[in-house]
Amino acid sequence: MAYRVLVWGLGAMGSGVARNVSQKEGLRLVGAVEKDPQKIGRDLGEYLGGEKTGRQIYSDVEKAVSETRPDIVVIATNSFVEEVLTKIETVARHHVDILTIAEEMAFPFFSHPEESEVLENIAWRYGVSILGTGINPGFVLDLLIIAMTGACLKVDRIEARRINDLSPFGRTVMRTQGVGTSPEEFKKGIETGEIVGHIGFQQSIAMIGNALGWDIDRIEESREPIISKTERRTSVAHVLPGMVAGCRHIGRGYCGDKLMIELIHPQQILPEKEGVDTGDYIDIFGEPDIHLSIKPEIPGGKGTIALATNMIPAVIEAGPGLLEMSELPIPRCLLNEIKEI
């Protein structure tokens, strides 16, 4: 048995998911959807750097779904709920399950209650499962923390830090992080909403709070530019000394006046250029205290690609509804033929 997978969006992450899916014994990549005229109509296998497969890159998702008959569509196009809601409904009308790496979809119930109700209704109307996931939100600063609290008798508060490298990501992430801007442009971008830093603090904090039964009634965020002292260059970004290399973003979740969850997430391209070591650090204060250090960081690009691939069977095998990671079977790497979870 092989699940049929259609990928919508062939940016850095979407292409990675498509390539990974094509290498899995229990998954079959049946096509992709793109808006870039230079990609449309090309052979998908050849575009991904392999041999011709006869599977094409479509411009029209309706035609793609009708012709390829996927079990699931992986949407890798946008970060925000409002941007993917219509796309999700378009796929759902074909009674096809959906997995998206849109960060706000990891746990939209707190930040977008009205849209979440709409999505829940769509899921039940068409009998489909909908899940948002990725490395973060979706794993490091939420699901992994939730799993670790399972070894605690009680939990008083949580602190976690993810110090990571943005280099593997594409232009959309660079833009939302302010990479390549001047300090003045960064400040203006924060004010206009063009620069948002990390997308997902509200989702991660709300997911943790929901899992632990904490009534998180307020989430506060702060953002500061990371000014580069060195020249840095990736395939999609070029930063000179004095320009912004990333964003130091902090999210805090409160129950009343009590700080329960603090997540710290400085993200920048090529942090090693200035001697910064990446890593993931989780501190759970309770009984007992638990402290986890992962060095270097779990790579953001590979981690997102892996989770978007590895969660496919769980989404297909789940019942209808708008799902979130903590209510599904724990992620595991797909190595061989898929067995029912």
Language model: regions and residue ranges:
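Alpha-helical support elements that line or immediately flank enzyme active sites
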Residues: 139-150
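A short hydrophobic/small-residue beta-strand
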Residues: 97-99
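Conserved active-site and cofactor/substrate-binding residues in soluble primary-metabolism enzymes
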Residues: 8, 12, 16, 68, ...
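Active-site-lining helix/loop region of Rossmann-like oxidoreductase modules
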Residues: 8, 149-280, 298, 305, ...
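N-terminal glycine-/serine-/threonine-rich beta1-alpha1-beta2 phosphate-ribose binding loop
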Residues: 1-94
